[in-house]
């Protein structure tokens, strides 16, 4: 069978399961499995068929069984899970997608490359890096960075391609959440891998892990987990009805209503992201052309990089020209959109995703890190001068992670004079304010807000699904209707008057009111 035939047959089986036509679904799945050489899946289906036959036999005999509904749900669940694995197994044999090439290469990984073993390597990184800093010329740092990044990559790819966690996998994954030595960026990357894996195939253990991760103390981790839960439910809107223990955990998380409020915020951010193309068009056709038409005004505006602080005020004549040109309205509109959380930088950075760094899928999900080898290569371990200013800007919450990497790679390849000019035009912050400890601290605090972190992560995901080289291999949820409040498992959590008012507003600006 080719990919299309596999997908169509799988969807037919799923439709039968949703309609609770279990016997027909099992018959279709049996035929489906004849194309697969996986005897484990065949045995699992045979056991499910036998259990269902016994249940029907007892019903015909009039035997009362108070556990019948529970047993039926378990048989239906098992049948669905077998169908999931059968689909992947068959696609592994014919698909050229990166995900399936990863699955086909999983057997080449040494058995000792489990989550726990990789965790130990990652945990050693901070100490190894500290030792290198004490050595002359940071001796050995390249090897330490390479080892760390390759290990994080293996963990990401092996987690993404593992469609069915064992109990041992789940336990080891919980160890990552409990570790006090694991670098936060590595845990963030792992959280994204769990989400990607759930997008390919529903796995109760991974979903349960995300529910654990939502309560993690680190904001970057718990916000990624929240977004991961939203994506998993958008990809599998009805599956949780088969797992009452997961539904119960969702309800427990929302006992005080805080989980619902946070998930609702993620919901709004996802809805807002669907308006990015409109904003992008507005930027390209209205705002940027207006700025280009008034380039002389822009050039004569004072952005805080002048030697004489007394000259920092805008010349009144230029200010008058600035307002009469209409440029002031355009810039204010852009600022308002940005304050609302809109993705105003997509048009700017869309053309800057061709660097080699972005050829690897996992790099799209790695939090920005000035100590990443690709950044150290361009700016050194301790940025100075204009690079230090750039570093401060990158600590703010103005750009998502992938845009920060793009900005660094772009800055590294332009002359110093142009770099200074670009920095002055990319921020309205005064240089003194940037270098002032209290104000730079305020920027960092802004960047650490949960709503800023989750919104920037949604921007990262949007770029991955729209711009990555392998974007056509993924289902783009941003092209579809996003209706989290209609998902059965979330009705009691999101369908509350104070929350419904927010996501049913006609525009992002209204939603924020």
Language-model segment annotations:
Residues 13, 174, 195, 230, ...:
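Conserved small-residue packing positions in alpha-helical repeats and bundles
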Residues 503-512:
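Conserved small/polar residues in nucleotide/adenosyl-binding loops
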Residues 136-187, 192-205:
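Alpha-helical solenoid scaffolds in large eukaryotic transport, assembly, and signaling factors
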Residues 17, 198-202, 500-501:
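Hydrophobic/aromatic side-chain positions at a characteristic register within alpha-helices
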Residues 173-181, 189-245, 252:
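Extended amphipathic alpha-helical scaffold segments
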Residues 6-8, 21-27, 34-129, 149-153, ...:
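Non-TPR docking regions that flank or precede TPR/alpha-solenoid scaffolds in eukaryotic proteins
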Residues 1-11:
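Generic start-of-chain signal for non-secretory N-termini
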């Amino acid at each position: 069978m080719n990919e299309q035939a596999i997908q169509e047959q799988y969807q037919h089986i799923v439709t039968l399961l949703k309609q609770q036509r279990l016997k027909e679904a099992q018959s279709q799945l049996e035929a489906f499995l004849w194309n697969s050489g996986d005897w484990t899946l065949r045995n699992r289906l045979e056991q499910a068929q036998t259990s269902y036959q016994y249940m029907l036999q007892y019903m015909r005999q009039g035997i009362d069984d108070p556990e019948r509904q529970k047993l039926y749900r378990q048989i239906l669940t098992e049948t669905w899970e077998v169908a999931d694995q059968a689909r992947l197994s068959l696609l592994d044999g014919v698909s050229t997608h990166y995900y399936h090439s990863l699955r086909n290469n999983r057997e080449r990984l040494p058995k000792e490359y489990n989550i726990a073993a990789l965790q130990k390597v990652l945990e050693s990184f901070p100490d190894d890096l500290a030792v290198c800093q004490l050595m002359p010329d940071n001796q050995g740092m390249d090897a330490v960075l390479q080892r760390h990044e390759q290990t994080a990559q293996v963990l990401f790819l092996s987690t993404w391609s593992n469609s069915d966690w064992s109990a041992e996998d789940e336990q080891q994954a919980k160890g990552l959440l409990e570790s006090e030595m694991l670098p936060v960026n590595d845990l963030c990357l792992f959280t994204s891998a769990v989400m990607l894996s759930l997008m390919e195939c529903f796995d109760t253990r991974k979903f349960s892990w995300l529910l654990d991760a939502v309560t993690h103390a680190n904001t970057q981790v718990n916000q990624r987990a929240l977004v991961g839960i939203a994506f998993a439910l958008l990809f599998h809107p009805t599956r949780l009805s088969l797992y009452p223990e997961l539904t119960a955990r969702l309800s427990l998380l929302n006992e005080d209503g805080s989980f619902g409020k946070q998930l609702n915020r993620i919901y709004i951010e996802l809805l807002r992201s669907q308006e990015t193309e409109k904003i992008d068009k507005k930027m390209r056709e209205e705002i940027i052309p207006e700025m280009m038409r008034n380039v002389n005004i822009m050039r004569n505006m004072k952005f805080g990089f002048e030697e004489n602080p007394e000259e920092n005020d805008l010349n009144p004549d230029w200010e008058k020209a600035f307002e009469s040109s209409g440029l002031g309205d355009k810039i204010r509109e852009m600022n308002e959109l940005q304050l609302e959380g809109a993705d105003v930088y997509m048009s700017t950075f869309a053309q800057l995703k061709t660097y080699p760094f972005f050829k690897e899928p996992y790099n799209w999900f790695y939090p920005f890190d000035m100590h990443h080898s690709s950044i150290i290569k361009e700016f050194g371990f301790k940025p100075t001068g204009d690079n230090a200013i750039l570093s401060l800007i990158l600590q703010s919450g103005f750009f998502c992670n992938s845009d920060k990497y793009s900005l660094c790679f772009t800055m590294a390849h332009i002359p110093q004079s142009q770099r200074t000019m670009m920095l002055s035009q990319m921020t309205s912050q005064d240089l003194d304010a940037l270098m002032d400890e209290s104000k730079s601290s305020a920027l960092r605090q802004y960047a650490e807000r949960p709503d800023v972190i989750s919104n920037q992560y949604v921007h990262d995901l949007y770029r991955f699904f729209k711009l990555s080289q392998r974007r056509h291999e993924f289902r783009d949820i941003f092209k579809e209707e996003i209706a989290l409040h209609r998902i059965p498992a979330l009705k009691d959590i999101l369908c509350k008057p104070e929350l419904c008012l927010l996501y049913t507003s006609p525009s992002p600006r209204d939603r924020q009111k």
